[in-house]
Amino acid sequence: MHVFGLIGYPLNYTLSPQIHNYVFKRLRIDAAYVPLRVASKRLLHFIEFSRDALSGFNVTIPHKVAVAKLIDELNDDADTIKSVNTVVNSNQKLIGYNTDYVAVEESLIERGYKGEEALLIGAGGAARAVVLALSKTGCRAIKVLNRSRERAVELCGLANGLGLDCSVVDIGGNYGKPHVIINATPLSSEEYWLLNLGELGTMLLLDMAYKPNTETDLIKRARELGIQVIDGVEILVRQALAADKLWLGDFNEPSASEVIKYIKGINPS
């Protein structure tokens, strides 16, 4: 039996086990997926433990950048952004990948995104994946909004290296008229209004955050304004299916829409 897991902290809630275990059952694969609460001080210990105990694992907040420094090898995309959300155990050799960017890229392309200006909220591991996805979809310019300006400047360095025209914008500053807004933070309900969505002329909003039984306030506000939305559940499902392919090889996977429908059906709002 294959055992896979998700590491993060504090990992208060996650839909990942429901997604992966549904796929395993649907495909009649002898495997299980479990959440594993791992604090930063125990991360190195977990990495060594996983070599014998797990066939692979996913990584979430706050470990995506740290894990990239601790495992044996990174594929080209993960190495470019130094952020890992999926680890494959290949005969005790831990190889890191990033499927977050795959999920973002797929969802943007499906909505007809063609590289228009973007506003990115956040500068952590998830934001690094967004920058890579935007570069692959032909994005020309992005602005980065983050509480820590230093981290935003660092992220812009990565973006510039990928050929994007990147600038940092302060909270309450000039956000411009971004075609797409992407939230790559666990933005709280008290903060979403800082964006003044109604004044930005945004056509598409992608929120990587999600809640188990309801939409985030950012998604709700965007819907009220008639803005097309991509929610965090869709991103979670798409990155999970990409991770399963890395772990299990090519298989006749269920569609993202099928899995999204299942997950939202068992977690009604």
UniProtKB/Swiss-Prot annotation:
Pathway: Metabolic intermediate biosynthesis; chorismate biosynthesis; chorismate from D-erythrose 4-phosphate and phosphoenolpyruvate: step 4/7. Pfam families: Shikimate_DH, Shikimate_dh_N. GO terms for biological process: amino acid biosynthetic process; aromatic amino acid family biosynthetic process; chorismate biosynthetic process; shikimate metabolic process. The keyword DNA damage does not apply. It comes from the Archaea. Keywords: Amino-acid biosynthesis, Aromatic amino acid biosynthesis, NADP, Oxidoreductase. Shikimate binds at residues 14-16, 60, 85, 100, 210. The keyword Amino-acid biosynthesis applies. The active site is at 64 (proton acceptor). It catalyses: shikimate + NADP(+) = 3-dehydroshikimate + NADPH + H(+). HAMAP family: Shikimate_DH_AroE (MF_00222). Involved in the biosynthesis of the chorismate, which leads to the biosynthesis of aromatic amino acids. Catalyzes the reversible NADPH linked reduction of 3-dehydroshikimate (DHSA) to yield shikimate (SA). Belongs to the shikimate dehydrogenase family. Homodimer. This is Shikimate dehydrogenase (NADP(+)).
